Structure formats: structure tokens, C-alpha cells
Curated annotation (Swiss-Prot):
Residue ranges annotated as Cytoplasmic topological domain: 1-10, 64-119, 168-169, 225-239, 295-303, 348-370
Keywords per UniProt: Membrane, Mitochondrion, Transmembrane, Transmembrane helix
Major localization class: mitochondrion
Induction info: Repressed by thiamine.
Domain of life: Eukaryota
Name the record gives this protein: Thiamine-repressible mitochondrial transport protein THI74
Domain (EamA) ranges: 129-190
Gene: THI74
Entry GO terms, CC: fungal-type vacuole; mitochondrial membrane; mitochondrion
Annotated organism of origin: Saccharomyces cerevisiae (strain ATCC 204508 / S288c)
Transmembrane annotation, as ranges: 11-31, 43-63, 120-140, 147-167, 170-190, 204-224, 240-260, 274-294, 304-324, 327-347
Residue intervals annotated with topology Mitochondrial intermembrane: 32-42, 141-146, 191-203, 261-273, 325-326
Length: 370
């Protein structure tokens, strides 16, 4: 693959990330509306529902299996039919002798692919769930803008993790970006707390802590997913991967849902009216689509680029808070956001050698299924 091809892949990844940013801010607004207003304050169930819905990605595979079984049954039926002439039998015999071998090889390859994907999905479903649960729960205590901004610190967690795994190079400029971002975050959190007279400072502390926990979890599964794909040369089938993440989430976390209901920490109940049901389903659809785009963008770009893209959720989240909550932002709040923007430019700076290294790596062969 030439450098032009690489640029095209990268551009496609960036465009997908742009869609993801819009979708994620929209999902944050919907979740915030459900949780903070107590219209449907069920962060665990919402997370469980959103991620379990990924199982629907296996529908095409299930349909192909059904069609394959039907075709196989039809072929076995046809083989039992009487053959009227020796000539027709001799023409058909080679097909019969070659079919089992070919089918066996294809089946072996397919089984290996499914097992690798299932292993990867099982490994990441817990990280995925915990990170999303923390991010959703944070919206019960803080604003969309604060949650989104704090979640964007995953870029810095990603930098350290990716550097330790050899996926990313470390530089003084990127380290400077970390400190600039930290200063901006402090300004933003302080101003967010001052704006909310009706909510205690401890609630904001809980919300901000959960947002940071979600940020750390996000950076861990993003970096490790890219590492697993790159280091082992896996050809990731995104639909199958997400599908099994949904299946494992559904199977592993339903006991916790029951425990939360029994202990009254989060009672299980369906939405009480159409409006809430609509918001819940819309949020689920947004996550369903956007996380597919996110996976594709991760493969086409890099963990750091994907996490840096969260920067652009900040102005959108601020606008969402302005529209939904009639929030106001002090000059210090805006300055904090500017600091974070500057820090991401520093962290995302790449030299020519890094670009050439990526070119060489991609030319070795694609890892993305068409």
C-alpha cells in the first residue's frame, strides 16, 4: 500500500471519528436527561442494555449459518436421488470427493477466526462495561461538559499505556501537553462546581471521579485492543467482535442487575411512559452505531488519534449544556478549554519519522477485513 492509500485510510478514520464525536455527545445529553432529572436513573441497566444490544451484530452470521445448514441439508438430499446414467455419476463423483476436503479447510479457518474473536471479546467486555458504566454514572452527578472534558483525559492515559507497549513514541512536547491539560482540567472542574448551587461539592467530586475512572478504562481497552490486533496480526471482524462483546455482557452481568434490584441500589423497572422509552431506545441506537464506527476508526488510525478526537466533543458538549441546561461559562472556564485544546495539539504532534514508520508498518499488510 502506498502513502496515498495510507492517507485515504487515515482520512476515512478521521471522518468516522467526526461522526462518533457527534453521536457520543448526543448520547451523553440523552443519558444526562434520563439520569440527572431522575426520569430513568438506571445507569447500570442503561449500560447493560446498550452493550448487550451489540449482540444484534451477530444476526447476519446467524442468518448465514441457517442458510448454510439449509443448503447442506439440500445437498445431502440431492445425493440420495437415483443417478440414471453412469456418465452423470462419473461427472458428479469428483465434486463429491473434493467437497469434504474444501469444506473442512474452510470450516477450520472459520473456527479459528471465531475462537480468536470470542477470546478478544471476552477479554474486553468487562473493561468496556466498567468504563461505560463509570461514564454513565458520572452524568448523575455532573454536567455533560464536565464529564466529556474529564473523559478526554484518556488521551494522556493512552499516551503512557501506548508508550509502555511500544505503540506510541514519547516526547518532551507530549509531556508538556500533559501538564497543560492538567491545568486546564483544574480550571474547568472548579468553575463547574461554582455553577451548581443546588448540588453539593461532594456530588461533583463523585461525578468527576467516575468520569476519570471511565476515562482510564477507555484508554486501557482502546490501547490493548489496538495492541492485540497489531502485535498478533489479527484480521478483526468488527461485527463479530462487537457481537460477542454483547453476548458476553448479557451473560456475565445479569446477576449483578438482580443483586442491585434486591438491595434496592438500583431497582429494575421498565420506562414508565413513551417519552422515556423513546429516549432510552434512541440512546441505545446511537451507541450501537457509533461504537462500530469507533472500532473501525481505531483500526484505520491509532489509539492516540482516536482518544485525541474526544477533544472535539468539548465545544459540542458546552453547546449542549447551553441548550439543555441554560448553563453559563465564565472566562476561566473558556480558558481551561483552550488549555486542553493546546495540550492536545502538543500531544498529537508527530514527526516525519513517525509517519514514515507508520507507512512501513502498513505496507507489511492490512489487518482489516474488507
Amino acid at each position: 500500500m502506498n502513502r496515498v492509500g495510507i492517507d485515504v485510510d487515515h482520512m476515512i478514520g478521521v471522518l468516522l471519528l467526526a461522526v462518533v464525536v457527534v453521536f457520543w455527545v448526543g448520547a451523553s445529553c440523552l443519558t444526562n436527561e434520563l439520569l440527572e432529572t431522575n426520569a430513568y436513573n438506571k445507569p447500570f441497566f442503561l449500560t447493560y442494555l446498550n452493550i448487550s444490544s451489540f449482540a444484534l451484530y451477530l444476526t447476519p452470521d446467524l442468518w448465514r449459518i441457517i442458510q448454510s445448514r439449509r443448503k447442506s441439508l439440500q445437498e445431502r438430499t440431492e445425493r440420495t436421488l437415483p443417478i440414471h446414467t453412469q456418465e452423470s455419476f462419473s461427472e458428479f463423483l469428483p465434486l463429491l470427493s473434493s467437497t469434504p476436503s474444501t469444506s473442512s479447510n474452510l470450516s477450520s479457518i472459520a473456527d479459528t477466526k471465531v475462537k480468536d474473536t470470542m477470546r478478544l471479546s471476552l477479554l474486553f467486555c468487562v473493561l468496556w462495561f466498567v468504563a461505560n458504566l463509570a461514564a454513565n454514572a458520572a452524568l448523575s452527578y455532573t454536567t455533560v461538559a464536565s464529564s466529556t472534558i474529564l473523559s478526554s483525559t484518556s488521551s494522556f492515559f493512552t499516551l503512557f499505556l501506548a508508550t509502555s507497549l511500544g505503540i506510541e513514541t514519547f516526547s518532551t512536547k507530549k509531556l508538556l501537553g500533559l501538564f497543560v491539560s492538567l491545568f486546564g482540567i483544574i480550571l474547568i472542574v472548579m468553575q463547574s462546581s461554582k455553577q451548581q448551587d443546588s448540588v453539593s461539592a461532594s456530588s461533583f467530586l463523585v461525578g468527576n471521579t467516575l468520569a476519570l475512572l471511565g476515562s482510564l478504562g477507555y484508554s486501557v481497552y482502546t490501547t490493548l485492543l489496538k495492541y492485540e490486533i497489531s502485535s498478533k496480526g489479527l484480521r478483526l471482524d468488527i461485527q463479530m467482535f462487537l457481537g460477542y462483546v454483547g453476548i458476553f455482557t448479557f451473560l456475565l452481568f445479569w446477576p449483578i442487575l438482580i443483586i442491585l434490584d434486591i438491595t434496592h441500589m438500583e431497582t429494575f423497572e421498565l420506562p414508565s411512559n413513551f417519552h422515556i422509552s423513546f429516549l432510552v431506545m434512541l440512546n441505545c441506537i446511537i451507541i450501537f452505531v457509533s461504537d462500530y464506527f469507533w472500532c473501525k476508526a481505531l483500526i484505520l488510525t491509532s489509539p492516540l488519534v482516536v482518544t485525541v478526537a474526544l477533544t472535539f466533543t468539548i465545544p459540542l458538549a458546552m453547546f449542549a449544556d447551553f441548550v439543555w441546561r441554560e448553563a453559563f461559562f465564565t472566562p476561566w472556564y473558556i480558558i481551561g478549554v483552550i488549555f486542553i485544546f493546546v495540550s492536545f495539539f502538543l500531544v498529537n504532534h508527530r514527526g516525519e519519522s513517525a509517519v514514515e514508520k507508520d507507512c512501513a508498518a502498513v505496507e507489511k499488510g492490512p489487518i482489516l477485513d474488507a
